[in-house]
């Protein structure tokens, strides 16, 4: 039986890490795409040369033409530019919107049946634009945000309590930015909700609040430490978890930037919510009841995403007709 083809659009730090993880997990054959000649070919060859050591048989190729992604079952998009000092939000939106339009056209032509995972920032606006540009069903196009944000929250909690990360469950909703909503009430250690752990004396509310703030600023913390780049290991692992749930029909419940059409009171926008991912894509949106501060924070997050989407509509009004 032929292996699944997994196309990675963008061969930077995340793209290269994704390719290596696909090989290590033997999820399929990899096509690394990039507009920079030689870069995807070089990275693909480097990773392929590690296969005898790591013991995987996935085939890796690099390409500069969208033709190479033909028939891909999964497409993961990291193409675009990061925000640089002095660059306004609209500058970043304008540049990466053009990239999403080009990528969307390539996917539409060569991989119209794929499950598409977008990682490009600003995430919630870019995944919206990518779905419009590709014309793929909304349930087959998602953004990678919540899995990463929740993983950071889980790691910080496990570190605080000195327990295994495997025993910590945590959910982060909303946009992928500083308005994200880490849900303390729905986060647990071995099934014990965090508020109960505060009562049990495992931690204090003030300490929990600090961890929530650190989660919101998790990406910025790494950027400030690296100084010349941003996170790529954890984002790549997060996208692979989503792809694996689709490819293996695992039906995992994971928070992703999903297209909402009335759920949570949101219409035609991509916002981070828990979903079930199976071989049909997003098979169910899990609608958690939000109240009080959580509801306020979620609404504020949605408003921030709405602002980004409105800016996209002004920059690229032709997307609306798609």
From Swiss-Prot:
Positions annotated to bind substrate: 83, 89, 121, 152
Entry keywords, A to Z: NAD, Oxidoreductase, Tricarboxylic acid cycle
Residue positions of the active site: 176 (proton acceptor)
GO term, biological process aspect, one: tricarboxylic acid cycle
UniProt feature coiled coil, ranges: none
EC numbers for this chain: 1.1.1.37
Record's protein name: Malate dehydrogenase
Organism, scientific name: Rhodopseudomonas palustris (strain TIE-1)
Taxon lineage: Bacteria, Pseudomonadati, Pseudomonadota, Alphaproteobacteria, Hyphomicrobiales
């Amino acid at each position: 039986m032929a292996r699944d083809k997994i196309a990675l659009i963008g061969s930077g730090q995340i793209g290269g890490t994704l390719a290596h993880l696909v090989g290590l997990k033997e999820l399929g054959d990899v096509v690394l795409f990039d507009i920079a000649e030689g870069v995807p070919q070089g990275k693909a060859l480097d990773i392929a040369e590690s296969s005898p050591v790591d013991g995987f048989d996935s085939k890796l190729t690099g390409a500069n033409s969208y033709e190479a992604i033909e028939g891909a079952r999964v497409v993961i998009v990291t193409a675009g530019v990061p925000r640089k000092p002095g660059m306004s939000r609209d500058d970043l939106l304008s540049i990466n919107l053009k990239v999403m339009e080009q990528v969307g056209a390539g996917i539409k032509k060569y991989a119209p049946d794929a499950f598409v995972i977008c990682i490009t920032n600003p995430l919630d606006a870019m995944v919206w634009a990518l779905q419009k540009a590709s014309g793929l069903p909304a349930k087959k196009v998602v953004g990678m945000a919540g899995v990463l944000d929740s993983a950071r929250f889980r790691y910080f909690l496990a570190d605080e309590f000195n327990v295994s990360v495997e025993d910590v469950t945590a959910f982060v909703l909303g946009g992928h930015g500083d308005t994200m909503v880490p849900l303390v009430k729905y986060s647990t250690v071995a099934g014990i909700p965090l508020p109960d752990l505060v009562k049990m004396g495992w931690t204090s509310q003030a300490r929990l609040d600090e961890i929530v703030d650190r989660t919101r600023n998790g990406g910025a913390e790494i950027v400030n430490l690296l100084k010349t780049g941003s996170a790529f290991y954890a984002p790549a692992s997060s996208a692979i978890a989503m792809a694996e749930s689709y490819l293996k029909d695992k039906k995992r419940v994971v928070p992703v930037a999903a297209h909402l059409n009335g759920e949570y009171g949101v219409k035609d926008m991509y916002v981070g919510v828990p979903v079930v991912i199976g071989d049909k894509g997003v098979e169910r949106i899990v609608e958690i009841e939000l109240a009080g501060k959580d509801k306020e924070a979620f609404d504020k997050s949605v408003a921030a995403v709405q602002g980004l989407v409105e800016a996209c509509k002004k920059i690229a009004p032709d997307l609306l007709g798609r």
